Amino acid sequence: MGEPADVPEAGQKKKKFIMVVDGNPKDALTTSMILQNFGYSVTTVKSAEEALEFLSIAVPSLVIAEFILPGMNGIVLMDRMRRDPVVSKVPVVVQTSDPDPSGRDRCVEAGCILYLRKPVTGEDLYRAVQAIIERTPRKNVRVPTYLKASVEGTGTGAEFVTVISEQGMFVKTLHPRPLGSKHTVSFSLNKKIIWVEAMVLYTYGFGEESAKDPGMGMKFMSIEPADLALIKTYIQESFSAGTPEGPPR
């Protein structure tokens, strides 16, 4: 059964591919790691020339490019892409440190779908990517995880929270509960046991969809504010893991 937009879905689906074009190694790594932590497949190149070479052999779902690049700039890159029928429809987001206020108009005129000024937060990047390439954009940041869980205190040892957001979670289990049923779920997060009351909004049985884990998407109905704050912090730390700045302190 299909899942609502704001509740995490099962894993194992094919990852969408994003290309990051940035000559600044730190910025390129930051953007790449955040996108990977959100579950996307990412390739990073440092120039427009490298980007065009790569685009000749692979077509990404999205290109995120710096305007200021060594050699060709982002405007030239977008112009070359628009002239190539194979990649002309690939959306381009410009994410730049360029201080020139006229840059936005120039990039939009060249064909970029969105213009972002650095630094860009992980939440803003997530929502931008969701809005552009996902069929059902999600309002809440969700991250993949693997937390041992217990539903109604009867954990079998084979139930895990595999995706989590501020609004809900996906529980991987061979025994999904009935749609609309409410359950007490506990899971360990950073050495603390979190208890939530959650309702089943959609399920996947074993073998129903080969690309989906069996289990259930659950919406939080009741959760302590302190526990919700822990989940928010965990999500922030998860999507910033591996970046030069690392998780926020």
Model-predicted regions and their roles:
Residues 1-249:
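Structured alpha-helical
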